[in-house]
Every structure is written in C-alpha cells, then in structure tokens.
C-alpha cells in the first residue's frame, strides 16, 4: 500500500513494551481501568464483503460461501456501553433459536481487553473457540472495516476447521452493538 511517507509493507502495531511500562500508563478517565495498553490500536484497513441473494450470486457465476442465519443491532445502557456485545449475543441467539452450544466459533471484537473478558464471564463460552486467531489487540481495529474483518476471519476459520457456524459481535459506537450468526455453505 502506498502512503504519503512511502510504501507501507508492514503492520504498525505492536510496539515493544514491558509490564512495568504498561503499569505506568494513565487510564483514559481518572480512576478508570482502560489505558492505551488495554486497548486495540486503530489501524489502517480496507475490506469488502459481497452480500447477495443466493440465486443472484449463482446467476453471476459466484459460489456462495456462507449465509446469514440471524443478525441484530441493539442499543446498550450508555454508562455500560461495553456490555453491548453481550446483550447483542443474547438477542441474536434468541432470533436464531440457537444456543451457544450450536456455535462453533466466536469473534468478539475487543476495542478494550475487558470486552471479551466480560463477554466470556457472562456467556461462559469455551475460550478456545473465541477469537482463535487473535482479536483486535493482536490484529488491529480497522475502523470502518472491523465488521468485514471479523466476518472474514470467522468464515476462513470455519473453512479451515470444516466447521459450520460462527457468531460475530462487536460494539458499534454510541453505546450500540451488533451480532451476526453465519453458517458456512
């Protein structure tokens, strides 16, 4: 990718650090827990996901790889807005008639490390099925293409494992959150 400073050929995060350096970081708000060390870096990214009716895709010679089983967008209590992915998970499971046991993989976006930890505490999902290739702290948080990145990561991993279903959830800003369940075809 070309940028003003030349060619960008490597990821800008993660930087070298230590536990001592992380412990010295100030929280975002006085008395808070979130610091730059517990947050994902905002990274450059671009993505495209083609959504189409299955018949139209086939008419165009395209092979559908997955279908959307259910999805939702919810508003969370603004003071507790980081709980949104948990509430969205409950809503999308109810809409689909599925349970956590029906889901093979989970992608839970983590703008802050506490989001996925809270989600795990609430839902008690198997941590070995959550963000199996790393979450936003490891991979970056490409604002504007995070949903596409999560969905694509989930679909590729379903194909690698020959698994069937994934649940993707993330904060959507302004105390909103979304969740989607996909089924590999």
What annotation goes with each model-predicted range?
Residues 34-47, 69-95, 104, 108, ...:
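Active-site pocket-shaping loop/turn-to-helix segments
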Residues 7-13, 78-85, 110-128, 142-146, ...:
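Short glycine/threonine-rich loop-to-helix capping motif typified by GTGT followed
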Residues 1-59, 122-129:
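N-terminal extracellular/periplasmic Venus flytrap/periplasmic-binding protein-like
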């Amino acid at each position: 990718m070309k940028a003003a400073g030349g060619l960008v050929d490597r990821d800008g995060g993660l930087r070298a650090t230590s536990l001592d350096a992380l412990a010295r970081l100030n929280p975002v708000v006085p008395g808070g827990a979130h610091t730059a060390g517990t947050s994902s870096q905002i990274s450059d990214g671009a993505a495209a996901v083609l959504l189409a009716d299955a018949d139209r895709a086939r008419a165009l010679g395209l092979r559908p790889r997955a279908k959307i089983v259910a999805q939702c967008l919810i508003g969370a209590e603004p003071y507790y807005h980081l709980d949104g992915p948990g509430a969205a998970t409950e809503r999308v499971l109810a809409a689909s008639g599925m349970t956590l046991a029906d889901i093979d993989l989970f992608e839970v976006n983590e703008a802050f490390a506490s989001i996925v930890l809270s989600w795990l505490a609430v839902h008690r999902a198997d941590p070995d099925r959550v963000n199996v290739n790393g979450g936003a702290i490891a991979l970056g948080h490409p604002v504007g293409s995070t949903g596409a990145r999560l969905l694509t990561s989930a679909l590729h991993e379903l194909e690698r494992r020959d698994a069937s279903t994934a649940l993707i959830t993330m904060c959507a800003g302004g105390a909103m959150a979304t969740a989607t369940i996909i089924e590999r075809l």
